[in-house]
């Protein structure tokens, strides 16, 4: 263990200090506060940016999905044999998705006597032997020639399962 002698350590003495009385004490202080300008948040600008992001996201989702297509159900929710909707309009080239809504076998054929002249119905129709047997199965077509097209389901045409599309 190391020994420390009194000569090596000096302890200050505070005996000569006097306390100032409260009446004689003067305290003076000044402070200068300067604030640097901070950028203000703009809620309006933030909402514009968020809105633009939402619109851009929605637009890309619509382009990537069937949002630009018309969905036509084969069979109504109540079980009736019908196209839903049975009549509709689409712009030329827009995709039409026919979707089996029931467990019944359906198909989609375009009537060769009820399409614009020059349209080859074999290129836009399903084969008469092909059927959408299960619920959720689909057939897609895009019609490019303007005019009225009549279509039907061959197994249920006699029951009135007929529809019409107008291509603008």
UniProtKB/Swiss-Prot annotation:
<feature type="binding site">
    <location>
        <position position="106"/>
    </location>
    <ligand>
        <name>Cu cation</name>
    </ligand>
</feature>
<feature type="transit peptide" description="Chloroplast">
    <location>
        <begin position="1"/>
        <end position="69"/>
    </location>
</feature>
<comment type="similarity">
    <text>Belongs to the plastocyanin family.</text>
</comment>
<feature type="binding site">
    <location>
        <position position="156"/>
    </location>
    <ligand>
        <name>Cu cation</name>
    </ligand>
</feature>
<keyword id="KW-0813">Transport</keyword>
<feature type="domain" description="Plastocyanin-like">
    <location>
        <begin position="70"/>
        <end position="168"/>
    </location>
</feature>
<protein>
    <recommendedName>
        <fullName>Plastocyanin B, chloroplastic</fullName>
    </recommendedName>
</protein>
<dbReference type="GO" id="GO:0009535">
    <property type="term" value="C:chloroplast thylakoid membrane"/>
</dbReference>
<dbReference type="InterPro" id="IPR008972">
    <property type="entry name" value="Cupredoxin"/>
</dbReference>
<keyword id="KW-0809">Transit peptide</keyword>
<keyword id="KW-0472">Membrane</keyword>
<keyword id="KW-0934">Plastid</keyword>
<feature type="binding site">
    <location>
        <position position="153"/>
    </location>
    <ligand>
        <name>Cu cation</name>
    </ligand>
</feature>
<dbReference type="InterPro" id="IPR028871">
    <property type="entry name" value="BlueCu_1_BS"/>
</dbReference>
<dbReference type="InterPro" id="IPR001235">
    <property type="entry name" value="Copper_blue_Plastocyanin"/>
</dbReference>
<dbReference type="GO" id="GO:0046028">
    <property type="term" value="F:electron transporter, transferring electrons from cytochrome b6/f complex of photosystem II activity"/>
</dbReference>
<keyword id="KW-0249">Electron transport</keyword>
<dbReference type="Pfam" id="PF00127">
    <property type="entry name" value="Copper-bind"/>
</dbReference>
<keyword id="KW-0150">Chloroplast</keyword>
<dbReference type="GO" id="GO:0009543">
    <property type="term" value="C:chloroplast thylakoid lumen"/>
</dbReference>
<dbReference type="GO" id="GO:0005507">
    <property type="term" value="F:copper ion binding"/>
</dbReference>
<comment type="function">
    <text>Participates in electron transfer between P700 and the cytochrome b6-f complex in photosystem I.</text>
</comment>
<keyword id="KW-0479">Metal-binding</keyword>
<keyword id="KW-0793">Thylakoid</keyword>
<keyword id="KW-0186">Copper</keyword>
<dbReference type="InterPro" id="IPR000923">
    <property type="entry name" value="BlueCu_1"/>
</dbReference>
<feature type="binding site">
    <location>
        <position position="161"/>
    </location>
    <ligand>
        <name>Cu cation</name>
    </ligand>
</feature>
<dbReference type="InterPro" id="IPR002387">
    <property type="entry name" value="Plastocyanin"/>
</dbReference>
């Amino acid at each position: 263990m190391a020994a420390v002698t009194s000569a090596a350590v000096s302890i200050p003495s505070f005996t000569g200090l006097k306390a100032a009385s409260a009446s004689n004490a003067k305290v003076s202080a000044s402070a200068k506060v300067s604030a640097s300008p901070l950028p203000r948040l703009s809620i309006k600008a933030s909402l514009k940016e968020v809105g633009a992001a939402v619109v851009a996201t929605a637009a890309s989702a619509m382009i990537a999905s069937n949002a630009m297509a018309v969905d036509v159900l084969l069979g109504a929710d109540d079980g009736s044999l019908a196209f839903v909707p049975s009549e509709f309009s689409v712009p030329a080239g827009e995709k039409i998705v026919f979707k089996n809504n029931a467990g019944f076998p359906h198909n989609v054929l375009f009537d060769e006597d009820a399409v614009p002249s020059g349209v080859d119905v074999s290129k836009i129709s399903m084969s008469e032997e092909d059927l959408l047997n299960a619920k959720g199965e689909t057939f897609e077509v895009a019609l490019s020639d303007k005019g009225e097209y009549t279509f039907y389901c061959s197994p249920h045409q006699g029951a009135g399962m007929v529809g019409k599309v107008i291509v603008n």
